[in-house]
């Protein structure tokens, strides 16, 4: 018994509440972002290309999600899943935007892509990643305990197949580029989003933000982002599906657009409003509401030859400390042993006056409003997305940190004050790229 207690003692400790501005990682971030210089080179051109690659397995594989889905194979295919890519080039800088119909962009996939994506095509640091955050798509990509909790038994072939599809989508998009114009679109959809963390006590991010492209030959593409979680389909429904983003993308492509892409926005604490007779009716209703917002958006045309800059910066953090109780946490070495250790980073892409910032987490929609307003004072339209290729759990508003809730206990892995810290990270990027 004494030996057991000693072993347990080596694995647990108390939560560290040291203010983040007193921590070494904060100073490290300030040093990293301080070295970023705004790219002032004049654009000579603006071209865009897009492509998609079907990643639907030929036979059932484990799904990544929660509840009944956790590690179990899907039973039927409701709708196919894809990787989609948009490649943009202004004559000086080239970058890619990639979204996959997955729960997240898995760190295991990012690791493969860091070797696969080289300067010959588009290097990893010039690729902006996101996902639709469907909870009914391909698993098998998580190592250690993360596989047990989220994605089923680890399968390196699944990781390689996803990475290869992303690579091929970028190559295909790059091979078919045309001169194009760029626009920013913004509208509100207050009817299809709720605060699932604290209900009416908290706020929501109801903005539907989109980037539109139209080529000289009249082809149209649109990238849209919204904050409501892709959790319409219940966990007992064992189907492969993109959830409501799939219905949205298909509807946009059957209407005014030749190509559509969806990226989960600041989905932390944000849930959909489920209205309908069954899961699939609810998906259609949710997608219809978001689509109506997209189609009624205010449109801001960008410069014919927009400036462009892409950055990928390491994101320093305090050591991981996942909670066992609200005050007792696992030591960092236990977490790393159980979940693996992967690089963490923040990605940002500025195209004209549009600034996209990708975070390695479920980033809370409650944190976006002030950032959006701040960006507009700097002349920028901000789009914050989650699941950039790293993953650290949920980042929620700090005022909820001591609440015994799923997002703030089970999925809070890196200690206190991260709401404030991550907001500061994004403000620093706004300042540097404005």
Task: Enumerate the language-model features and the residues they cover.
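Anionic-ligand-binding alpha/beta catalytic cores of soluble enzymes and soluble regulatory domains
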Residues: 290-293
